[in-house]
Amino acid sequence: MMKLNLFINANETESYIDIHAPKMNDHVQSIINAVNDLDKSHTLVGYIDKEIHIIHISDVITFQVINKNVTAITRNQKFKLKLRLYELEKQLPQHFIRISKSEIVNKYCIEKLLLEPNGLIRMYLKDAHYTYSSRRYLKSIKERLSI
């Protein structure tokens, strides 16, 4: 059980968070990630033909580069974005994982993993398709998924 103390002081010039813990663990890291994600945007602007759509990041299953365009894929739609993948990666919450040079997946949309004999990871996603990680990102993926 974690204890929480909140101190409201009108004399403070800015809000800040102190974390006291006997050691670094998954709970502490989750708190740090949640606090860091507070400043990140929760929506993106996507395009379908000439229509402009507001996309909630939590609805996105994966971001893929398709024909040199970054595409946000949700359960029902594919939206073109005007961002580069590396720009998008900086804006996304911690639960989005870069799995290759051309794809970022939502960790919460991964249904199962299959370790292939060649060392790659096949990821089955909620929209009933699968994708592969690249070897270059394998170590990072395993760390982020705790496998």
Swiss-Prot record:
User: Which molecular function term from Gene Ontology is one that the record holds?
Assistant: DNA binding
Q: Keyword Membrane, does the record have it?
A: no
> Which domain of life does this protein belong to?
Bacteria
Q: Which Gene3D superfamilies match?
A: LytTr DNA-binding domain
Cite a GO CC annotation.
Answer: cytoplasm
Compartments it resides in:
Cytoplasm
Keywords (alphabetical) are: Cytoplasm, DNA-binding, Transcription, Transcription regulation
UniProt domain HTH LytTR-type: residue ranges: 44-147
Name this protein carries in UniProt = Uncharacterized HTH-type transcriptional regulator SAB2242
Look up and give the organism this protein is from.
Staphylococcus aureus (strain bovine RF122 / ET3-1)
